[in-house]
Amino acid sequence: MATVAASSYPPPLLDAAIALHDGQLHIAEPLLKQYLKRDPFDARAIRMLAELAGRIGRNRDAENLLRRALELAPAFTAARANLALVLYRQNRAPEALAELDELLATEPDHVGHANLKAAALGRLGGFEEAIGLYERVLAAAPHQPKVWMSYGHMLKTVGRQADGVTAYRRAIALQPTLGEAWWSLANLKTMRFEDADIAAMTAARGSLALAEDDALHLDFALGKALEDRGAVDQAFAHYAAGNATRRAQTGYDASVIAARVDASITLLTPAFFAERAGNATRRAQTG
């Protein structure tokens, strides 16, 4: 199976695709697994199962599935694009770039491939090339707030702060609730927000449909803006709210770390190490 036909998806795969689109992973997973029991060589189903694995953070499983799909169908560009994304998510930017270069060789005008390549280059210090790619993407698709924000990150990194601010502002104009763009502005130490900015952030923070990450970044940005104005109590109320959200996300429990440190202090005494002096050397000699 060297290629993948897009027009002949069987009903079980169409149902699984709809479930994936709607975020109903509990429906998509059994459909895909049952289908693959009947036809374990269908690269389309394997790619869809890989996408499901990636959505729940099982990136290694997703990678293995995608490599299998590409063994079966080397020209399956959707699977290769998914593989590049999974590698990028695992901080394996050089490997992601290799896949993206292959994709762009056959689909040179694909803005999604160019956008991901720009992000991967940014992780490797290829800032100028990344900027060029972002400019190409934005010329073709100018209404993408997160791309404008990523472009702003690259501009800021190379010292083009004024251009970076313009890019962040463009992102915010397209999506006023984009918390990371507001925080990126706040994180510029010379930035001072106007009354209109604070009003816009406050309105965005009150949005009922606000994503958790947007909320916490808006809290941090509002905290910085209000602190700069001397409104300390209001500022730290926002800092506290943002940190509470972040702590809930990470599941960090300081008492667990404290207990481990206390146990280590109790166990790892000078006498403990003296009793075991030379153990590593003896093991190396007898190994």
Walk through the language-model features, giving the residues of each.
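Alpha-helical solenoid repeat scaffolds of the TPR/TPR-like class and their adjacent stem/linker regions
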Residues: 1-287
